[in-house]
């Protein structure tokens, strides 16, 4: 059997912040036996729960376009 190494989680946050801080976002590849999808997770201030957004790979390009369109209009 041949093995591989995959990166399936990247953590993005302010420099020096703990990985459980509410400002930190975890971007992950997940799979529940129906194909892989992206998950964005953030811990809430109460530290006992998290917020999760699940995104299908086909949906991602349109979400990126929408985010960029709105970001360009920010003041």
Regions found by a protein language model. Give the residues of each.
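Positively charged, low-complexity terminal tracts
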Residues: 1-75
